[in-house]
A protein has these predicted regions:
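Rossmann-fold NAD(P) dinucleotide-binding segment
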Residues: 75-120
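C-terminal substrate-binding/catalytic lobe of Rossmann-fold NAD(P)-dependent dehydrogenases
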Residues: 179-302
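Rossmann-fold dinucleotide-binding core
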Residues: 79, 113-230, 234-235
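Conserved N-terminal Rossmann-fold NAD(P) cofactor-binding segment
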Residues: 31-81, 102
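Conserved active-site and cofactor/substrate-binding residues in soluble primary-metabolism enzymes
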Residues: 34, 96, 189, 193, ...
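NAD(P)+-binding Rossmann beta1-loop-alpha1 motif at the extreme N-terminus of oxidoreductases
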Residues: 1-50, 121-122, 354
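Anion (oxyanion) recognition and catalysis
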Residues: 21-22, 106, 271
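C-terminal active-site/capping subdomain that shapes the small-molecule cofactor and substrate pocket
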Residues: 267-354
Length: 354
């Protein structure tokens, strides 16, 4: 049965959308008016490399069995949807029209699957060790999440690396690392049934007889998506330096021993919260994947471009580590550098200052 899925965020969201469309489900992308008009006219293109193929293939939404449309936040009719995907960067949810839509989503009690790096606050409330911690400081505006029931919000580890090529239109996405979305289960079994249905449908898709990478994998453990934290703190946030941004590869491989110590420390924090070592990704596997990540992280690129706010998983992990009594000088240093770079932009003239 075709499901109808609403995804907030048309850039990274178009990757999950394409996988759902290939499996015969219908998707609405929520974005700016100009981008919505472009997508409604031309569809989306996601470039992905299949196993054993040398070049990326363009997968066009208009050629897929599911139907795609795009709309602005104000025009969403929530009664049409079975599931909401959260694919915007965390600071974007503070936009007024998005906030209004988020209030409606919370009131409609629709299950929400996040593919953000920054875990939604209600998701963290599902983890007993975090439920009473003071973590609001890490969010641009924590009030956005106040109305959501924790059991209705789950998180995917957004491992696939993808970016919008700067020379292309806003409906094109290039997938650099086609790994899987690893989702934790919802609290409600009916919602998990839907999630596992989508997992199976995506898994069954082939293209010219070839398997298509980037699957949706569902896990019972709430801690599987937290494996991403070790990667973000070791690579993505350390792309932000006091000077120019560096690539993820250089951040990780510049001092492999230091990188492993940071990675292991964050893994240790997740285990203190209740994660099983099986929920985690070995450092060696991550370091190998990082060899092919030749660009700075999206966070580093955003800071370099003058963004006044970015997702702050670095600060979130710092707050948790201090409240657990397990701080790390290296993590604290990373947070300090990110704060310093963001403050430079604000002092230089706020949003958009170069």
């Amino acid at each position: 049965m075709a499901r109808n899925i609403l995804i907030l965020g048309a850039s990274y969201g178009s990757l999950l959308a394409t996988k759902l469309l290939m499996a015969g489900h219908n998707v609405t992308l929520v974005c700016r008016k100009k981008t919505a008009e472009l997508i409604n006219r031309d569809g989306t293109e996601v470039r992905i490399k299949l196993r054993d193929e040398a070049v990326h293939r363009g997968i066009f939404s208009r050629n897929l069995p599911g139907k795609l449309d795009a709309t602005t936040p104000a025009e969403v009719d929530l009664s049409r949807y079975d599931l909401v995907g959260l694919a915007m960067q965390e600071p974007q949810y503070t936009n007024h029209t998005i906030r209004v839509l988020m209030i409606k989503i919370a009131e409609a009690k629709l299950p929400c699957l996040s593919i953000m790096n920054m875990p939604p606050l209600p998701y963290l409330k599902r983890i007993p060790a975090l439920a009473d911690m003071d973590l609001e400081e890490a969010y641009t505006n924590a009030q956005v999440w106040e109305r959501f029931q924790p059991g209705l919000v789950t998180l995917c580890s957004p491992d696939p690396q993808a970016f919008r090529p700067p020379e292309e239109a806003a409906n094109v996405l290039h997938v650099g690392l086609p790994t899987n979305f690893k989702a934790a289960a919802f609290a409600d079994e009916q919602h998990n049934k839907l999630l596992r249905e989508l997992e199976a449908d995506i898994d069954a898709v082939t293209l010219d007889g070839h398997d298509v990478p980037v699957k949706l994998k569902v896990f019972d453990s709430l801690f599987v998506p937290l494996a991403k934290w070790s990667m973000l703190l070791t690579g993505n946030y350390r792309c932000i330096t006091p000077n120019d941004p560096q690539s993820i590869r250089d951040a990780v491989h510049g001092d492999l021993k230091l990188s492993q110590s940071i990675y292991d420390h964050v893994d240790g924090i997740a285990r203190r919260l209740g994660a099983d070592p099986q929920d985690q990704v070995p450092f060696g596997k991550y370091a190998k994947a990082a060899e092919s990540l030749l660009k700075p992280s999206s966070a580093a690129r955003a800071v370099a471009a003058g963004a006044p706010f970015i997702e702050r998983v670095d600060l979130l992990v710092k707050l948790i580590s201090h409240q657990l009594g397990a701080p790390s000088a290296e993590i604290d240093r990373t947070v300090e550098i990110v704060d310093q770079k963001l403050n430079e932009k604000i002092v230089a003239g706020g949003s958009g200052a170069q």
